[in-house]
């Protein structure tokens, strides 16, 4: 399965590939579970546009690595894993709780989301630029220095 939303910019949708038997079984499960939509053309159009964004996924991953490496080298916070294989960066916020970390981060103009009591998740995607990564790193660095 290949997801078209999030990083690729579509509001919803995925592509499922497989053998004829697999796809027939998937269709059956979809019907049994109440899936399916009528008038889905507008969403399909967004999916077609998202497919054109596939070449940019490597940029999302490059930015995630830049963010992770910057946090690790310039702040007291740790990142797990240190070299993210995807566009998600998980930050260990200790000695702060995730809520305190997020509150302080927001005071520098950067928003993120808690991912547990002492972890925060940051995600790069189609709408995150290199300048945004630099801003986030600057904010996290200031936050770290203030501790």
Segments (PLM) and residue ranges:
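Conserved C-terminal alpha-helix-loop-beta "cap" of PLP-dependent enzymes
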Residues: 72, 76-144
């Amino acid at each position: 399965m290949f997801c078209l939303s999030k990083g690729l910019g579509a509001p919803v949708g995925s592509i499922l590939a497989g053998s004829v038997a697999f796809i027939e079984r998937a269709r059956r499960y979809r019907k049994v579970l109440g899936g399916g939509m009528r008038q889905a053309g507008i969403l399909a159009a967004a999916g077609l546009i998202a497919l054109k964004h596939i070449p940019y996924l490597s940029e999302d991953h490059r930015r995630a690595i830049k963010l992770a490496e910057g946090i690790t080298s310039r702040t007291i916070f740790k990142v797990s894993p240190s070299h993210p294989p995807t566009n998600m960066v998980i930050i260990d916020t200790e000695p702060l709780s995730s809520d305190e970390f997020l509150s302080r981060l927001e005071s520098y103009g950067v928003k993120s989301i808690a991912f547990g009591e002492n972890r925060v998740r940051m995600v790069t995607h189609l709408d995150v630029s290199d300048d945004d990564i630099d801003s986030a790193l600057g904010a996290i660095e200031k936050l770290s220095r203030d501790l």
